[in-house]
């Protein structure tokens, strides 16, 4: 058994690096909260790679906080197994902007178009007081 590991362990390590693809992404945007304009300051924003395979969890690609005007820029890299399998990025935004109807605050998840560097994903205005079920 130990001989097997000695001979084949380097192969498995090498093949994992060869068969995975690393991609990096940058996303920018401006957070808006019409119900409380001050709530766009220092908002926690995570960039995640969704892994839908069984026994895999999503990977944190990057993290940032918005500035006092709600501007943010988040960058990160992720690797997915397979030469044609690219990361599936999304933003997870934890905020304190009250919903325009109910005053509740819920985190927002936004799928990001997988445009990898050198391209930049420009999200424009991201309204924190509206949710998908509003539309």
From Swiss-Prot:
GO terms for molecular function: phosphatidylserine binding; protein homodimerization activity; protein-macromolecule adaptor activity; scavenger receptor binding. Residues 131-135 are annotated as: Required for mediating binding of apoptotic cells by ced-1. It is found in: Secreted; Cell surface. Residues 1-20 form the signal peptide. Disruption phenotype: Loses ability to bind apoptotic cells and results in reduced ability of cell corpse engulfment. Pfam families: TTR-52. One of its GO terms (biological process) is aminophospholipid transport. Changing residue 85 to A: Loss of function of engulfment of apoptotic cells. Decreased membrane labeling and phosphatidylserine binding and failure to rescue the engulfment defect of the deletion mutant tm2078. Expressed in the intestine cells. The keyword Ribosomal protein does not apply. Belongs to the nematode transthyretin-like family. Plays a role as a bridging molecule that mediates recognition and engulfment of apoptotic cells by cross-linking the surface-exposed phosphatidylserine with the extracellular domain of the phagocyte receptor ced-1. Important for the generation of extracellular phosphatidylserine vesicles that promote loss of the exoplasmic leaflet from apoptotic cells in a time-dependent manner. Required for the exposure of exoplasmic leaflet on the phagocytic cells surrounding the apoptotic cells. Does not affect the phosphatidylserine externalization in living cells. This is Transthyretin-like protein 52. It comes from Caenorhabditis elegans. The gene is ttr-52.
